[in-house]
């Protein structure tokens, strides 16, 4: 079991590392490539677009051909793309590399969740996903620090050399440590069961909506945080970085506490708590009259996401013993596209940063509480495949 956890954690961590590692070098990258920082800032969106593209096919391929080949392919693609970024001589080539890098990270991300679905029951999976969420929260804090230390001695290309090393490590884990977890029953004889695992069943759709709205909340918070903290509250860059590090610390603390809470409380209780914290955050931010109250509202967002997201993801994957890859892909695509759609729509409507955040907090909490109260899992809604194949 340990091998699956190590490999899954490594596969997932390529995704945030690919986002956060290079940010500290952005000014120097822009100068060397004769591009503006504004032009290169779309590298974030390009990376997510690459991930979404990979998710369109990675899940289905993983269900048909196995988790291990897709994990290896994703790591190799990530390595090649990182090398392309390090050799880029203009902005267009750099953005192309970032898109391909997103494809590699997307393949690995989908496979990681499929592996956890294959090897863990619902309660253990919820605990592991909560821990994984906490570890993921560490990356946005540590990756820029590591990037800064690297750039004290080396050029910006070394940031992508570091990503190449990470990709090689994941590839080696996938080749030599990871064992195939795709259910051995995935064959023509299992076609009726595969067809029965419909992506249109109401329980899956409810958890799809909950996870998508929750990701929309946290990404809206991240997207609006510079405006909220630096423009509206007057923080300088140092104070902004410190505040974001503290919120990440809260996320980590809650994520690491959630597995213990699952031993005491029902998953539904934690998900309702999550949405209650979102609702409270929306109310606090809408009524806030001081910086301290606003900061308290922001901490509620981080705590709410951390206590409920892993549990909701676990339940979403629960009904799929033979189509875990496809289900993981659908969840990933919905979360990336749904959150991007909300941020774009709110900007088009003309919401300011604070109202954009308050709107998604209150809307998310009300919809999700309704879904949690009305749609619950069946008594025996999942089948676990403990065996693995070399």
UniProtKB/Swiss-Prot annotation:
What SUPFAM superfamilies would the database entry show? MFS general substrate transporter
CC annotations in GO: plasma membrane
A Pfam family annotated for this chain is MFS_1
Signal peptide extent: none
Return the PROSITE patterns for the record.
MFS (PS50850)
How does this chain sit within the bilayer?
A: Multi-pass membrane protein
Cellular location(s): Cell inner membrane
Q: What is its main location?
A: membrane
Q: A GO molecular-function term, please?
A: transmembrane transporter activity
| Keywords, ordered alphabetically | Cell inner membrane, Cell membrane, Membrane, Transmembrane, Transmembrane helix, Transport
* Transmembrane segment boundaries: 4-24, 42-62, 69-89, 93-113, 131-151, 158-178, 199-221, 245-265, 269-289, 293-313, 316-336, 353-375
- Which family does the record claim for this protein? Belongs to the major facilitator superfamily. DHA1 family. MdtL (TC 2.A.1.2.22) subfamily.
HAMAP family reported for this sequence = MFS_MdtL
Designated name of the protein:
Multidrug resistance protein MdtL
Q: Which organism is it from?
A: Citrobacter koseri (strain ATCC BAA-895 / CDC 4225-83 / SGSC4696)
């Amino acid at each position: 079991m340990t091998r699956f956890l190590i490999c899954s954690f490594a596969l997932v961590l390529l995704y945030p590392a690919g986002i956060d590692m290079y940010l500290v070098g952005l000014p120097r990258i822009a100068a060397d490539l004769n591009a503006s920082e504004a032009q290169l800032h779309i590298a974030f969106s390009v990376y997510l677009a690459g991930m979404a593209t990979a998710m369109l096919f990675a899940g289905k391929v993983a269900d048909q051909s196995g988790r291990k080949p897709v994990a290896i392919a994703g790591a190799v693609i990530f390595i090649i793309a990182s090398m392309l970024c390090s050799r880029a001589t203009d902005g267009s080539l750099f953005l192309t590399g970032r898109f391909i890098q997103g494809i590699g990270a997307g393949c690995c991300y989908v496979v990681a969740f499929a592996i956890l679905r294959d090897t863990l029951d619902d309660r253990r999976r919820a605990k592991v996903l909560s821990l994984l969420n906490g570890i993921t929260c560490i990356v946005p804090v540590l990756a820029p620090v590591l990037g800064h230390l690297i750039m004290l001695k080396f050029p910006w290309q070394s940031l992508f050399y570091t990503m190449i090393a990470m990709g090689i490590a994941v590839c080696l884990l996938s080749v030599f440590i990871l064992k195939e977890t795709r259910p051995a029953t995935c064959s023509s004889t299992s076609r009726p069961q595969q067809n029965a695992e419909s992506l249109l069943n109401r329980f899956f759709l409810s958890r799809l909506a909950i996870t998508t709205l929750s990701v929309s909340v946290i990404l809206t918070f991240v997207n609006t945080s510079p405006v909220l903290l630096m423009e509206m509250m007057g923080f300088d860059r140092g104070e902004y970085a410190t505040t974001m590090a503290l919120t990440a610390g809260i996320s980590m603390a809650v994520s690491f506490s959630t597995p213990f809470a699952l031993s005491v409380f029902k998953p539904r209780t934690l998900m309702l708590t999550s949405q209650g914290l979102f609702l409270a955050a929306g109310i606090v931010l809408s009524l806030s009259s001081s910086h301290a109250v606003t900061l308290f509202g922001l901490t509620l967002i981080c705590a709410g996401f951390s206590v409920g997201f892993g549990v909701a993801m676990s339940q979403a994957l629960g009904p799929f013993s033979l189509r875990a890859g496809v289900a993981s892909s659908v969840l990933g695509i919905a979360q990336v596209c749904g959150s991007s759609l909300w941020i774009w729509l709110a900007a088009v409507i003309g919401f300011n940063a604070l109202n954009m955040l308050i709107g998604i907090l209150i809307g998310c909490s009300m919809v999700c509480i309704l879904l949690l109260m009305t749609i619950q899992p069946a008594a025996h809604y999942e089948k676990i495949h403990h065996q693995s194949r070399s």
